[in-house]
Amino acid sequence: MSFALGQRWISDTESDLGLGTVVALDARTVTLMFAASEENRVYARSDAPVTRVIFNVGDVVDSQQGWSLQVEQVVEDQGVYTYLGTRVDTEESGVALREIFLSNQIRFNKPQDKLFAGQIDRMDNFVLRYRALTNQYQQHKSPMRGLCGMRAGLIPHQLYIAHEVGRRHAPRVLLADEVGLGKTIEAGMIIHQQVLTGRAERILIVVPETLQHQWLVEMMRRFNLHFSIFDEERCVEAFSEADNPFETQQYVLCSLDFLRKSRQRFEQALEAEWDLLVVDEAHHLEWHPEKPSREYQVIEALAEQTPGVLLLTATPEQLGRESHFARLRLLDADRFYDYEAFVKEEEQYAPVADAVTALFSGEKLSDEAKNKITELLSEQDVEPLFKALESHASEDEIALARQELIDNLMDRHGTGRVLFRNTRAAIKGFPVRNVHLLPLEIPSQYTTSMRVAGMLGGKLTPEARAMKMLYPEEIFQEFEGEESSWWQFDSRVNWLLEKVKAKRSEKILVIASRASTALQLEQALREREGIRATVFHEGMSIIERDKAAAYFAQEEGGAQVLICSEIGSEGRNFQFANQLVMFDLPFNPDLLEQRIGRLDRIGQKRDIDVYVPYLTETSQAILARWFQEGLNAFAETCPTGRAVYDAFAERLIPILAAGGGEELEVIIEESAKLNKTLKSQLEVGRDRLLEMHSNGGEKAQQIAEQIAKTDGDTNLVTFALSLFDAIGLHQEDRGENALVVTPAEHMMVPSYPGLPYEGATITFDRDTALSREDMHFISWEHPMVQGGIDLLMSEGVGTCAVSLLKNKALPVGTILLELVYVVDAQAPKRSGISRFLPVSPIRILMDARGNDLSSQVEFESFNRQLSPVNRHLASKLVSSVQHDVHRLITASETAVEPRVSAIREQAQRDMQQSLNSELERLLALKAVNPNIRDEEIEVLDQQIKELTGYIAQAQYQLDSLRLIVVAHN
């Protein structure tokens, strides 16, 4: 390397310093000043990591004064260059610009500039960049985008609802699946799709206070969506950042109580302009035409201001038609304006539902059913279908006609677009619950303390006394002190120890109401029998709970027993276990259902054993009998439980408080009767049409199968590992489909997106991720992959490379130039552009004569024949063929233009076809189904106009290039 004062060089390792100038030289070192970043660097002359900057005829260079020069001649004097040419702004010719006056800000961003400046990348980085572009393009185009990356089982009805709703603009729907069918996951999938496609950027989730953590965990674990819980303390903290604390975060989670209690916070939340509002447990919003509750008014105001609204409820409408109407009113007040009109309209659907049931079972349609269908659908549409059903056509034709009738009825179904409800009855695949009620003798220690407590408890309300009597171990501790070891004599603990020893190979989940009970049970198992158990309660942080859950999930060396408190277990699922022990009983049937729901969920592969050890002659025994004989709540899901409880609570509570009573038998008998009546009402009122629409039938199966195919994508594994390598992450194989990825010292960036500071355990396998909550499930949609690709692009990794092709059939020194162009439409993300015209790579392979060989020579097989070149040799090769490379770049533009036009045209066709058919369907439906909102049609119309413009304006640019030189050895 020969240096001279005033020469301009660029740093190979710190390209962001800008253009450097040689300011000092001695025998061993050279000093460069980088004026743009105000930095100096001293290098050893013999191997300084810098590259000489020399421009060529035809280049446009910037001066420090801000004007540009088109270079026509380059003159050298004692190692320093002067550029002669024409000024671009004044068109003055013969202007000289000495290199010392070149702009300090010159950056070599264009791939060809970097190539000529000697900033040549590794060959494998060029390959990685091209693969990143092609994979990203395929992901954006996939109709399943937003559904593949979540950590959840592929359950058809959930995927169908998410696919159906997630693609809508500002969806407003009511998700009313029964308990255990995964409404939270459906909502999460919808949110995930809306976020990925840019349709929703600001999201507010409002839930009951006890469910805040569950939602936080589910969104983070399953969808990599990081919400912030907002309470009064958080709002006060955020006040320093913004006047409105809700504007400091994009994704906010808060409790309904918090918004109800503070008018100021409620008004701030209203002003914060959300794109999507999600409300869980929406059945708690009470409404009467004259007097809506404060909670209802809070949500109503938010729903009016927010374009997208998802309401979640587990209560079927048959158990409260008025409150069902109130929920629909929140979604579309113009459509559901009057309760009486709504009831009338609902009544019209009853015969339709009957007709559909008949169609489904393949029975012959009655004349009444036919008339009803003809009233709803026009005669010319249905007549040929009726004929087909009654003719001697083939089974396939009859099935087709039947399906078409059902589809048409579904589209016309009043609430089909706003309401989704799946029931266990309509969805197969649930386990059987084997119930074991185990009456155990009450220890004398408890009898004494409970008798004394009964005498002292005069001031307590019956409800408080009833609650107290359910937990004799707590009463005993009140008298004997916190440290008293009740677990040494409690017969339930003795039974539990025997059961755990007898079921050594099984994982056992134990649920107790209180955190203190759970902790003491763990101590009992450990101290009395040395059994490995772990605890899960509300006093633990999310990370501690994750660790406990992972310890329980581990096949080898894990805990055999997990002991949960009531609140601690909310929202966690342990489908890999099928043994459930209820150490005590909760007061209300919903909580009981929630407990069993930890194991009895869709996706549970085995039947479940539910053990209920209870002490005789206590309130527990009464409650166990009422749950079992009055509600049958242990053996079956009990959607009616709450309604029956509300009807009998006043009579049942005093009996629980007293530990018995004459009226108990009557209450049990009457409860069973009411339960039966309510259940049959539910069955009669089952809306088959709605159920079919909600579970998606065949279509749902296809979606699940399509996603399952992408799950085993080895291409993703290879790509992700190369990506982590290129960025400098440390990887360690942990077996069991797991890898540990940690930040390393020499990373390209200080912190890697989506990767915690301490690193993470990752897996590419969905089943492993489902059983191990401490692992990240890596998919194309995961922030670590998406963020890594963004890093490659923004840091300019792999934009130029040089490779050797060892091929004796070609003369030595033959050159080929591989160029990757990208077509990109500058448009806001929320316009939906990425569905039709994502960043699209075009590969061109020019031979020395300027012919494009890309259609004959496929990228991967060609790449396997190439070998890398060290940087020094690469720079020499580039210098020797610089003129040819310039020529080939110009020639490649002629080759790329027709392909760009073809991409634009195809994108226009796809967009018009997809959105116009959607628009036509909505317009046709609007004529017969008042549930189609005008706003939805207007937005779609506007979207078509905007996208037409954006696609027409799409530009192309050179993203990366590789020079290939033929060698023989």
Swiss-Prot record:
Q: Which UniProt keywords apply?
A: Activator, ATP-binding, DNA-binding, Helicase, Hydrolase, Nucleotide-binding, Transcription, Transcription regulation
Residue limits of the Helicase ATP-binding domain?
164-334
- The EC code for this enzyme is 3.6.4.-
Q: Does the keyword Transcription apply?
A: yes
Q: Which Gene3D superfamilies match?
A: 2.30.30.140, 2.30.30.930, 3.30.360.80, 6.10.140.1500, 6.10.140.2230, P-loop containing nucleotide triphosphate hydrolases (3.40.50.300), Tandem AAA-ATPase domain (3.40.50.10810)
Q: List the CDD domains.
A: DEXDc_RapA (cd18011), SF2_C_SNF (cd18793)
| The protein's role, per its UniProt record | Transcription regulator that activates transcription by stimulating RNA polymerase (RNAP) recycling in case of stress conditions such as supercoiled DNA or high salt concentrations. Probably acts by releasing the RNAP, when it is trapped or immobilized on tightly supercoiled DNA. Does not activate transcription on linear DNA. Probably not involved in DNA repair.
**Metal-binding as UniProt keyword:** no
Any single GO BP term: regulation of DNA-templated transcription
The Helicase C-terminal domain covers 492-646
Instruction: Motif DEAH box — list its residue ranges.
Output: 280-283
Q: What protein name is recorded for this chain?
A: RNA polymerase-associated protein RapA
Binding residues for ATP: 177-184
* Homology family: Belongs to the SNF2/RAD54 helicase family. RapA subfamily.
Q: How does it assemble?
A: Interacts with the RNAP. Has a higher affinity for the core RNAP than for the holoenzyme. Its ATPase activity is stimulated by binding to RNAP.
UniProt organism field: Vibrio cholerae serotype O1 (strain ATCC 39315 / El Tor Inaba N16961)
